[in-house]
Amino acid sequence: MTKLSVNINKIATLRNARGGNVPDLLKVAADIQRFGGQGITIHPRPDERHIRYQDARDLKAIVTTEYNIEGNPQHNFIDLVLECKPDQVTLVPDAIGAITSSAGWDTIKNQEYLKEVIQEFQRNGIRTSIFVDPVLEMIEGAKKTGTDRIELYTEAFAHQYDLGNKNGIDPYVKAAELANELGLGINAGHDLSLDNIQFFKQNIPGLLEVSIGHALISEALYLGLDNVVNMYLKKLK
């Protein structure tokens, strides 16, 4: 079964819109796990516009499943991850001020830097994953960084699926097959939803984990958080 890690950035966005502590991020994280979620993902950004660095620290005691911290490995982020020691760190090349992630790493151009950062995290017992596009050269480059896993950036698949083009899965299948051959674990995320997750899961060999936030929280507004988490779990079996 592919594990479901729920990204709770949108909960923090809602909280920060009014100040105070409603909704309570820590309670939501605890409830998601109680409902069956198998992990919690956060993506703190330098401006702390949704997840705050203190949230990352506070969640350490709350997350009893798998704790995944995503972000661009700048100095402050590296320090935060080493302090919190999550189960997994996912390295994402997002620009400062970006609304959301928009591309994977160039694992050839950034290979030496990624290798250095990955080794630091691994020395501290943290599993590493790097965000990549479904491009075979980037998968090969990822292997050379020493990362434990890759996270396939699934925006292109989701867009094509919405248009009715199921062939949009093809590059992801090839990327996953190569990753499996190279011994890389496979995660995936970005624009996955109740509409497309089952098709994606059924076609990607060796898919270990998906990280879903925006769609899941949006769907929960209509269907309820407990219900939506379990709907995803059924589709990921």
Swiss-Prot record:
The entry's keywords: Cytoplasm, Pyridoxine biosynthesis, Transferase
Gene3D superfamilies: Aldolase class I (3.20.20.70)
Pathway(s) annotated for this protein in UniProt: Cofactor biosynthesis; pyridoxine 5'-phosphate biosynthesis; pyridoxine 5'-phosphate from D-erythrose 4-phosphate: step 5/5
Any one GO MF annotation of this record: pyridoxine 5'-phosphate synthase activity
Site (Transition state stabilizer): E151
Cellular component, GO, one term: cytosol
Example of a GO biological process term: pyridoxine biosynthetic process
Similarity-based family: Belongs to the PNP synthase family.
Chain's role: Catalyzes the complicated ring closure reaction between the two acyclic compounds 1-deoxy-D-xylulose-5-phosphate (DXP) and 3-amino-2-oxopropyl phosphate (1-amino-acetone-3-phosphate or AAP) to form pyridoxine 5'-phosphate (PNP) and inorganic phosphate.
Subunit structure: Homooctamer; tetramer of dimers.
Name by which UniProt lists this protein: Pyridoxine 5'-phosphate synthase
Lineage: Bacteria, Pseudomonadati, Bacteroidota, Flavobacteriia, Flavobacteriales
